[in-house]
Each structure stands twice: as C-alpha cells, then as structure tokens.
C-alpha cells in the first residue's frame, strides 16, 4: 500500500485555524485544539448575534422616537397610532433618523399624527 504524505495539508489546516484565532486570549490563540473549539463557539455566537442585532436596532429606534415624541407631549404608542390613522408610512428607522437629524421635520410629522388622533382616548378607532 502506498504511503500517504499529508504533512503539508495538516500544517496548513492548523495554521489557518491558529490565524483565525489570533486575537483570542491564552491557550485559545496558541493551541490548535483549544483554538478550533473556540472558533466553533465564535461562529455560533456570530450567527446568533447577527439575528439579535436586528431586534437591538429596532429597540434603539423605538427609544429614540419615544424620547423625541415625549418632548412634543405625546407617547410613543399614541404617536404610532396617529401615524397609522394619518396614512404616514415611515418605518421606525427613518423616523429615528429624522428625529435625530432634523427636529423641525419630525415636529411636523408629530403634529400630523396628533391631528389624526381622536380627541377621546377611549373612542373606537376606524382605520
């Protein structure tokens, strides 16, 4: 049976793993087995957190919008309801950006949402 010489492939495989783990602390950046294990965990964290990032940004946009509309004397919930009734279709990302970068435009949007709201808070809403 012929001899299989795999030293080059094995060294390359180990070198790639250790290069990818170069920023890790302690043995995780120096020992192949520890580095490989940490890389597998890192890939899982990366996948999970790419999904979580979307929710984190949505929470951030809602907080920014809430702070801006409370300065105008309305709650976030009533503001979103007013936007829907006024037929204004801006997503939370755009609203948060407008609230931060252009307060005058945001104030006009808030005024339009306020105008679309019914006077009585408990009145049935027809959308």
From Swiss-Prot:
A Pfam family matched in the record: Ribosomal_L20
Single biological process term from Gene Ontology: ribosomal large subunit assembly
Signal peptide: none
Top-level division of the source organism's lineage: Bacteria
Record keywords, A-Z: Ribonucleoprotein, Ribosomal protein, RNA-binding, rRNA-binding
Disulfide cysteine pairs (residue numbers): none
GO cellular component, one term: ribosome
Gene3D superfamilies: 6.10.160.10, Ribosomal protein L20
Single GO molecular function: rRNA binding
Function statement: Binds directly to 23S ribosomal RNA and is necessary for the in vitro assembly process of the 50S ribosomal subunit. It is not involved in the protein synthesizing functions of that subunit.
Family according to the record: Belongs to the bacterial ribosomal protein bL20 family.
Entry protein name: Large ribosomal subunit protein bL20
Gene: rplT
């Amino acid at each position: 049976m012929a001899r299989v010489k795999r030293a080059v492939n094995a060294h390359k495989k180990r070198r790639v793993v250790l290069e990818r783990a170069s920023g890790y602390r302690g043995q995780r950046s120096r020992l192949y087995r520890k580095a490989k294990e940490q890389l597998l965990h890192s890939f899982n964290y990366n996948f999970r957190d790419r999904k979580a990032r979307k929710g984190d940004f949505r929470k951030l946009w809602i907080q920014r919008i809430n702070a801006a509309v409370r300065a105008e004397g309305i709650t976030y919930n009533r503001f979103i309801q007013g936007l829907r009734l006024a037929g204004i279709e801006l997503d939370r990302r755009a609203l948060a950006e407008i609230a931060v970068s252009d307060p005058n435009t945001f104030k006009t949007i808030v005024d339009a949402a306020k105008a679309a709201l019914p006077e009585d808070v408990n009145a049935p809403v027809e959308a």
